């Protein structure tokens, strides 16, 4: 057999041996961009969608996941597991999930202030708190004009003046599942905590069961 014919025969045999393995390999479904599960309901928001961003499942096992808050400087995500009375943390670099705080007073919404401190709405204690950099908890609001709040739900910091806006519906006080069942003495409202004086003022009580808050960049 000539050398060229021998090499051709060997190459063909190797291809035949490898081909079945390649054909039976368990190929994963390729990622499609943009992710088909990310849908834009209002065309005005199309420009905010990142075309190469897929939806990922970070964790399972919570009873009611709420209030995600991203810490870009620490590369971790916090969120509330309200009925389990805990705050969870996901580390971006390792994917590890652990308990950040428990008990957490049935915390719901979270945000960060201009100094990077965590601000939280607590159903169980009917208050809005701030976690200082040393871990100490500061109460920002637990009443309005001397009357206990209902169950602060969501919170956001105003981009212009640093005021802390929060909603106060009744959800966390209706039953013990998401807080502590109790009487309601205030009309469900949206409030603002002044960044300078710390005083709480009512913004409106004309929104039925106010919940999520967000300010547009402009």
Where does each model-flagged region fall?
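Twin-arginine (Tat) signal peptide motif
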Residues: 1-7
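Sequence-structural signature of mature extracellular/luminal beta-sheet repeat domains
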Residues: 7, 14, 23-218
């Amino acid at each position: 057999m000539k050398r060229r014919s021998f090499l051709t025969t060997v190459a063909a045999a190797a291809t035949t041996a490898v081909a079945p393995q390649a054909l039976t390999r368990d190929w994963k479904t390729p990622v499609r961009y943009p992710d088909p599960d990310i849908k834009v309901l209002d065309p005005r928001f199309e420009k905010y969608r990142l075309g190469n961003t897929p939806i990922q499942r970070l964790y399972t096992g919570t009873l009611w996941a709420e209030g995600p808050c991203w810490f870009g400087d620490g590369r971790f995500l916090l969120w509330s597991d309200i009925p389990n009375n805990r705050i969870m943390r996901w580390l971006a670099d390792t994917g590890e999930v652990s308990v950040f705080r428990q008990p957490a007073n049935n915390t719901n919404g979270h945000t960060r202030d201009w100094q990077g401190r965590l601000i939280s709405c607590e159903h169980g204690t009917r208050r809005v708190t701030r976690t200082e950099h040393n871990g100490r908890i500061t109460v920002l609001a637990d009443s309005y004009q001397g009357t206990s709040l209902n169950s602060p739900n969501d919170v956001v910091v105003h981009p212009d003046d640093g005021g802390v806006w929060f909603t106060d519906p009744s959800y966390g006080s209706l039953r013990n599942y998401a807080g502590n069942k109790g009487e309601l003495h205030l009309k469900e409202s949206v409030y603002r905590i002044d960044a300078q004086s710390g005083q709480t003022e009512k913004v409106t009580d004309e929104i039925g069961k106010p919940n999520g808050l967000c300010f547009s960049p402009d």
